[in-house]
């Protein structure tokens, strides 16, 4: 890791001095990016009271528009010191696809990439494919599809059917991280994973100018990349899965978004996993749900600020499936709410811009409980054996933070200073291992960040 420090210094110097532009036609834009943050007591990246953590990003992005086509992508390389990789599964701002270590060192590195190729021939219809995430919902961390998981290969379209009605569809390939022993033998013992895929469609209807209703349905299916039953975007997946033997994982979500006045949005959504309509009101039902309610307000009390207040709650029976290859995860990260099932979060985020300064303050209270195999077996038993919420080992964490950020040198360089107070009960908790106990810690972390970015334009 010693070599990274002089390299970082050189890169920052280049970013501050370079801004090329060749010719005046449509540009191919490259965006090199560097960021490094020091956490004095590890923040939420390691479940100890003491111990500094450093995370450094090297990234190269590119984009190009030509006619109806647009292409954008990025490659990202991350290095980290004193990072507990398990902490990423309880952190909304960090995820990874491929984790590696340096030889002769405990330090870690990760790499990831994304790409979107978009074709739009009119304001009413567009098609895109590549490697990215689908994010459906108005919230910070949506219940059914959020941006807190790693990217995945996908193909999608967006069709504005009328002024009030919009349809979106996608199909994607996920990473199950379930070893396929039959394939491993063919590749000299290397890990080859069972296929897992997802298809989804969303119908949005503008009931009034300020009221929007959304109906979302997804299906996660394993042991195959594609399934012709789910290539039909206009038919409910709940009905189509009967043709596959009712073995797949169908999930539904409804959302209401209301803008009662300018600069204010109120939203709420409900998520239902493996719904059985005929038993909805029975004692033995499958009302496995999650729900979310929140609001976003711009210019709260004064100008140039944003306020977000959000509460999210998830049942322990959602996302996971009787057949593990059909669970709603990729790289072991949930596709929806970042804390996963059997969890809840209340969060307030306030952003204020004052001149060249940006200030952000957060209050987050999050809790999550066990997700054992016994609990999974019990939810599918007949009759169902009821599990009392949080009846066992659990983890809670409160974070109160304040951050200041300032751009200098024409906003090519940003400096950040953040203070975090963290009260963490059962830190290091593993929801899949009921016998593993963590620590109760309270700590204050001072976080120092530096970010450099510029654009290089070609024609």
Show which residues each predicted segment covers.
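Bacterial N-terminal signal peptides
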Residues: 8-19
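Exposed, low-structure sequence patches enriched in small/polar residues
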Residues: 110, 207-219, 224-459
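Outer-membrane beta-barrel channel domains
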Residues: 24-212, 223, 283-321, 325-342
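An exposure/low-complexity boundary signal
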Residues: 17, 131-133, 400-402
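Bacterial N-terminal signal peptides that target proteins for export
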Residues: 2-8
């Amino acid at each position: 890791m010693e070599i990274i420090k002089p390299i970082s210094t050189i890169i920052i110097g280049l970013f501050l001095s370079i801004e090329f532009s060749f010719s005046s036609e449509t540009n191919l834009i490259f965006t090199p990016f560097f960021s490094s943050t020091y956490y004095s007591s590890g923040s939420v990246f390691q479940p100890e009271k003491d111990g500094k953590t450093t995370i450094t990003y090297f990234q190269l992005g590119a984009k190009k528009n030509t006619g109806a086509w647009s292409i954008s992508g990025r490659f990202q390389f991350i290095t980290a010191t004193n990072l507990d990789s398990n902490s990423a599964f309880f952190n909304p701002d960090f995820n990874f696809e491929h984790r590696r270590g340096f030889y002769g060192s405990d330090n870690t590195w990760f790499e990831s990439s994304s790409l979107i190729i978009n074709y739009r021939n009119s304001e009413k219809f567009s098609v895109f494919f590549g490697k990215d995430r689908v994010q459906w919902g108005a919230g910070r961390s949506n219940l059914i599809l959020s941006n807190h998981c790693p990217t995945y290969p996908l193909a999608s379209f967006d069709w504005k059917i009328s002024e009030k009605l919009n349809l979106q569809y996608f199909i994607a390939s996920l990473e199950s991280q379930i070893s396929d022993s039959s394939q491993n033998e063919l590749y000299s013992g290397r890990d080859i994973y069972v296929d897992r895929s997802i298809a989804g469609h969303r119908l949005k209807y503008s009931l009034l100018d300020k009221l929007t209703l959304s109906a979302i349905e997804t299906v996660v299916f394993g042991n195959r990349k594609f399934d012709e039953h789910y290539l039909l975007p206009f038919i409910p997946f709940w009905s189509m899965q009967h043709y596959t033997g009712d073995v797949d994982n169908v999930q539904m979500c409804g959302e209401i978004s209301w803008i009662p006045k300018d600069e204010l949005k109120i939203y709420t959504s409900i998520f239902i996993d493996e719904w059985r309509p005929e038993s909805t009101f029975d004692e033995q039902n499958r009302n496995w749900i999650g729900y979310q309610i929140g609001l976003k307000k711009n210019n709260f009390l004064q100008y140039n600020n944003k306020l977000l207040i959000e509460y999210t709650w998830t049942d322990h029976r959602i996302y996971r499936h009787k057949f593990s290859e059909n669970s709603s995860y990729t790289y072991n990260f949930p596709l929806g709410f970042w804390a996963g099932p059997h969890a809840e979060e209340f969060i307030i985020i306030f952003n204020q811009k004052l001149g060249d300064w940006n200030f952000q303050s957060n209050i987050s209270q999050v809790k999550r409980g066990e997700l054992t195999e016994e609990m999974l077996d019990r939810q599918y038993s007949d009759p169902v054996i009821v599990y009392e919420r949080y009846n066992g080992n659990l983890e809670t964490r409160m974070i109160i933070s304040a951050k200041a950020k300032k751009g200098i040198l024409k906003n090519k360089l940003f400096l950040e200073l953040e203070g975090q107070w963290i009260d963490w009960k059962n830190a290091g908790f593993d929801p899949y291992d009921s016998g593993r106990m963590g620590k109760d810690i309270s700590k204050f972390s001072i976080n120092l960040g530096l970010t450099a970015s510029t654009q290089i334009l070609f024609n």
